[in-house]
Amino acid sequence: MDSEYKECVDSLYDKEDHLFYRDNKRIPLREKNGSKQFWGRGNGWVFAGLPLIIDNLPLNCPSRNYYIRLFTEMAEAVRKTQCKDGDWRTSLLDPDSYKMPENSCSAFMCFGIAWGIRNGYLPQRTYKPVLEKGWQSLVKAVHSDGKLGYIQPVGAAPKAAGFDATDVYGVGAFLLAGSELYKLSCTYH
């Protein structure tokens, strides 16, 4: 697993911005504001996936610190790309081109941050406000019937999604984030 994962990181991880390109075709592309194209949900997959890898590695695994370092590097980029209203957009470095939340991304980011705080990899003082703003933004997108809105449809690049746009992967990410927030609240109470 390590060699394949590291090969992907070497190919798709931007060491300057600490975010991932969706694929090699995206590396030369730029958003309307001239920034690199870092797709929110794609980075959410990685940011939420790293805790699952770390949780399943033995404490003495030689590559464990590699994944922890990657997670904490990404966490800082995730923190910096959060919008003032608490959400993350479909394009992480060009939020003005996509003025609405992208809640599959936002939920994955909240899950990762909550996990990082709970496990001691992210300082609570720095990341708890990010988590709280992110969660509040997600909750505002829950419809009266329980549906979660602002979930970008299946795609391979940033695209806008409205309040009524939903899909199971976004709802699943929201439930994952909520369960991790619950674990975090039990840890600190």
PLM regions with names:
Residues 4, 49, 53, 67-70, ...:
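Alpha-helical packing segments of well-folded alpha/beta enzyme cores
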Residues 1-51:
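Loop-centered beta-sheet repeat module
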Residues 29-48, 59, 63, 67, ...:
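Solvent-exposed loop and edge beta-strand segments that line ligand/cofactor-binding
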Residues 53-56, 115-117:
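Extended, well-ordered alpha-helical segments in internal regulatory regions
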Residues 88, 100-189:
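CBM-like carbohydrate-recognition segments
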Residues 18, 25-26, 93, 127, ...:
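Short capping/connector residues at structural and topological boundaries
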Residues 1-21, 68-86, 129-147:
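Long, well-ordered core segments of solenoidal/helical folds
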